[in-house]
């Protein structure tokens, strides 16, 4: 549950890169990552009262876990975005959040 590999049905292209799969290593994230995500959101006047139900928070967390920008996730087709953010949510819940 701490590592999720997402395989795209068709390659996803964004910013000159083509993605066939992405691996999200949620286990490598630290408390600093959580705080950094919250800080980034606050700087943009975005808030997550409950990260486990905030798609915005989950997408930023997933981006960090994969080492990509959150803009990459935001540009994905909705089914892929949903599966990836669901994996982030499941990880948060598994850690007792």
Task: Name the predicted role of every residue range.
Residues 2-97:
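Short, surface-exposed, charged amphipathic helix/loop patches that serve as local interaction elements
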């Amino acid at each position: 549950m701490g590592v999720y590999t997402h395989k795209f049905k068709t390659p996803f292209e964004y910013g000159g890169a083509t993605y066939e799969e992405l691996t999200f290593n949620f286990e490598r994230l630290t408390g600093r990552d959580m705080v950094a995500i919250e800080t980034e959101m606050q700087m943009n006047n975005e808030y997550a009262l409950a990260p486990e139900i905030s798609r915005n928070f989950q997408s930023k967390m997933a981006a960090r876990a994969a080492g990509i920008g959150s803009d990459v996730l935001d540009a994905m087709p909705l089914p892929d975005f949903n599966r990836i953010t669901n994996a982030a949510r499941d990880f948060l819940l598994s850690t007792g959040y």
